[in-house]
Amino acid sequence: MKTYLTLWFSSEGTEPTKVAERLQGMGFKPITGQYDHVYDWKDTVALHQILKLCTSVHQTLKGMHVLYKIETV
């Protein structure tokens, strides 16, 4: 499974490079195309694990004035 992250930045928020560094520290990799970052689980995961990652993303981006969308497939 993979979790994809799409980001929307504000000119009043944190610089995109700093946001990307934070997300990379969590295990996300920047990509090009439809999504901005991907987290590769390398296997099937339970819903509670996905929700735990979503909570971590939320806390990491808090205060950075970044909107985001998470999709796991």
Say what each PLM segment does.
Residues 1-4, 10-73:
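Long, contiguous binding/interaction regions
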